[in-house]
Amino acid sequence: MVSHTHKRRKRASATQLYQTCKAAGTCPSDVINKVEHTTIADQILKWASMGVYFGGLGIGTGSGTGGRTGYVPLTTGRTGIVPKVTAEPGVVSRPPIVVESVAPTDPSIVSLIEESSIIQSGAPITNIPSHGGFEVTSSGSEVPAILDVSPSTSVHITTSTHLNPAFTDPTIVQPTPPVEAGGRIIISHSTVTADSAEQIPMDTFVIHSDPTTSTPIPGTAPRPRLGLYSKALQQVEIVDPTFLSSPQRLITYDNPVFEDPNATLTFEQPTVHEAPDSRFMDIVTLHRPALTSRRGIVRFSRVGARGTMYTRSGIRIGGRVHFFTDISSIPTEESIELQPLGRSQSFPTVSDTSDLYDIYADENLLNNDISFTDTHVSLQNSTKVVNTAVPLATVPDIYAQTGPDISFPTIPIHIPYIPVSPSISPQSVSIHGTDFYLHPSLWHLGKRRKRFSYFFTDNYVAA
């Protein structure tokens, strides 16, 4: 048997995937973020580097110095043997260059997208603060070097970017906003805004509770179960009718204040004497009544609580009693036999009418010799008046007598009769002058002219 060994091909890196799928627009989001440095970690480092300065530590600078000690090469061999590495100061070892091999199945046409690398449109300009510089002191015996940084003129830079919404190169990375060393951020604005989403008018949904059936029946809430016949209640029947109107008289001899018989009765201090009805002994609470129907009768019920025993802490111990009175029975519905209408037993039924009437021929009924000469037609209408007697209601004999003899003193008032005569003799009214009023039909002088009246008062009216 010959075993064939298949060489495992190396998977394409994120950069290779980005070069081949970016033009087609099928790149995954994680590949685009990794190549374009837009991951969450890159964003954190980008914004954190604006306010934090690490100096020459070589963190995130991309210089490849590996810090103070440089890079330490990784072991390639058996595990478990730790190689001895001696760090020499001043000697910096760089990482080896990875050479990727080209397989025979790789495409011979090299994509030109690789040549268009990420374009940096510009680095932010950092302004030097106006205060004094940094003083550096060394530990040697030499004279320390003092860096005198002269303040420069502060210049405020505003960046405006004009974008073409028709085409935007995804490989161009927008620069970070310029930041001053003092921590002030210069915010730039863009003249082109993103496409706004489609504005859809919102409608208010009204929930209609329409009936689900053709003949809806209003539902009724189920009545709560009273539980009057449970094992926890003592059943006591009361025959005394006082239980319906004044049940407190069966519990105590006192004369209580008027209480509503339909409310719950509470007896705070039960008497030590025996109750008028021994069945109501030690009753401290009598709840409101309830009407129920059981086994064809109407039953009046009340639930009472006994206070048989009290503890020192004030806890009451006692049972519960169901007092009931059967008011009346519910009779069964009587079945009434219906009688046929239109027939009377007092009149006989005629079944054969052939012998009651004589049959004549039509020729015998015709008389052609009748003469209507010297005759006239007379229509008479008679009205018969029938008196209807309506019995009157009988009035009982009640002796009508006068009221008590009460006389009030009266004083006669005499008013003399004096004929009324006019105190002023009537005077005649004479009118002198030529005053007059126009007829209303003469007020309108034109179709579109204002209506007004003419009055002439040139003389006087004498009375």
Curated annotation (Swiss-Prot):
Its main location: virion. It comes from the Viruses. GO terms for biological process: microtubule-dependent intracellular transport of viral material towards nucleus; symbiont entry into host cell; viral penetration into host nucleus. It is found in: Virion; Host nucleus; Host early endosome; Host Golgi apparatus. Highly phosphorylated. GO terms for cellular component: host cell; host cell endosome; host cell Golgi apparatus; host cell nucleus; viral capsid. InterPro entries: Late_L2. Keywords: Capsid protein, Cytoplasmic inwards viral transport, Disulfide bond, DNA-binding, Host endosome, Host Golgi apparatus, Host nucleus, Host-virus interaction, Late protein, Microtubular inwards viral transport, Phosphoprotein, Viral penetration into host nucleus, Virion, Virus entry into host cell. Transmembrane segments: none annotated. The keyword Phosphoprotein applies. A motif (Nuclear localization signal) lies at residues 1-12, 444-452. One of its GO terms (molecular function) is DNA binding. Disulfide bonds join 21-27. Interacts with major capsid protein L1. Interacts with E2; this interaction inhibits E2 transcriptional activity but not the DNA replication function E2. Interacts with host GADD45GIP1. Interacts with host HSPA8; this interaction is required for L2 nuclear translocation. Interacts with host importins KPNB2 and KPNB3. Forms a complex with importin alpha2-beta1 heterodimers via interaction with the importin alpha2 adapter. Interacts with host DYNLT1; this interaction is essential for virus intracellular transport during entry. Belongs to the papillomaviridae L2 protein family. Minor protein of the capsid that localizes along the inner surface of the virion, within the central cavities beneath the L1 pentamers. Plays a role in capsid stabilization through interaction with the major capsid protein L1. Once the virion enters the host cell, L2 escorts the genomic DNA into the nucleus by promoting escape from the endosomal compartments and traffic through the host Golgi network. This is Minor capsid protein L2. It comes from Human papillomavirus 43. The lineage of its organism: Viruses, Monodnaviria, Shotokuvirae, Cossaviricota, Papovaviricetes.
